[in-house]
From Swiss-Prot:
Pfam families: Ribosomal_L30 (PF00327). This is Large ribosomal subunit protein uL30. HAMAP family: Ribosomal_uL30_B. Keywords: Ribonucleoprotein, Ribosomal protein. It comes from the Bacteria.
């Protein structure tokens, strides 16, 4: 049986109003637009980097 790819379940919990443009871009790249919106993101180096940039704004759970 093939190994399942790991994904992250990411939820935006805080607003990006007072954030830098770089942080706003990272949230948008993760696919988040509204507070309390949840998305699944495939595990990659780019995704991990964006998650680290905005870790104070989001909740992250590992799935798979």
């Amino acid at each position: 049986m093939a190994k399942m790819a790991k994904t992250f379940v990411v939820t935006l919990k805080r607003s990006t109003i007072k954030c830098t443009q770089d942080q706003k871009d990272a949230v948008r790249v993760l696919g988040l637009k509204k507070i309390r919106q949840t998305v699944e993101v495939k595990d990659s180096a780019a995704a991990r980097g964006n998650i680290m940039k905005v870790q104070h704004l989001i909740d992250v759970e590992v799935k798979g």
